Amino acid sequence: KTLGAIGKEFSTLEKVEGFDGNIIDISKPPFEGNFEDLFQLCGIDGNMSYENFEDNYKFNFSWNPDHFSSVLMWVSNKGRTEYPWNSNHVTVGFEPISSAFGLSTHISLNKENPIYKRNVATSIKLFKDKPLYSNYSFSISNL
């Protein structure tokens, strides 16, 4: 079951158009209902933080935004009914990417795709004899 409206843009996690047309806040899981969904957050500056007030910690994550210009946010909110999840799994994940996620490699490489047209890279050029090195860091601290 999908949480967010398909193909809609938003500028804050607190105001995302839902699949049913209502505005939802995806910044504070868990949510009512059972959902599995992905959101592409475009043009991220290479820094994200996640605050867990229940367990009193803050997770900081940074990476090279020249390599990964977006973040794929995946939301698992009891939407996986099969074993071993059995509708009990609740989590949010963040994965730095450079792609037009879910729209194929062909579209990600095409400079006419809607994400690239907004100056957000959707691919990384790799070379056989030149390894790509990319730095990242993460830390956890008390709130």
Role assignments for model-derived ranges:
Residues 59-143:
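Active-site pocket scaffolds in enzymes
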Residues 1-67:
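Active-site/ligand-binding surface loops and adjacent short beta/alpha elements
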